[in-house]
């Protein structure tokens, strides 16, 4: 059966490079001051979506993301790997959203897309580590949900079969579509970008990303697929009071970059004297014994 699949993806700050300018005065993350990457677990989710597309002829995969205009890069990265389209939720009213406001915005976007069979995203984003958005989207849409997915085994007869990680093992679950699925980072890694698709979608942008003096501006009329969908709060019939800072009961107080300092090291030999000295030291410090 053909499937309409939406991948929830996020452009996140590279948490390996957090500096002193990481926070704004309002207590939100200053994303403009940090290098941006495709959230790693969302790439795992994208791979599962692309495999479903291959297994079910006629299926489509779209990338849904929320952020400033530069977040369109996430959609391009998805197109380079085999996605068919994308939607960027971008509006100042979306800015500063916590998980509650984010899930509300994404849910309104999914409703506007319409007739979605599977919504799939990473278990959590590396800039928040809450793992809340996927389940909240499912709750807002009233859909079945499965978390900690390792693999979508098959979709047939209107049902999806999914293998998920649990404490001490794995379990296999099955339920009728539509589903909201969150995928672990331990799932299959995403395929690399396809050179032909990079060439095809190199200039794919949303309208807010474009500059009037671009030499390839005429391409957007000749090749409509290069225009990414760009939606505001009004476009998705959203309630401004439930979006961005206005709809966020929580906000980040601070972000700190903690660097673990190396401690003094000792080099020991296999001599009885060194081993005896080490054992006495460990006993004295109550590390063993």
Please identify what each model-predicted range represents.
Residues 1-289:
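N-terminal glycine-rich FAD/FM-binding segment characteristic of electron-transfer flavoproteins
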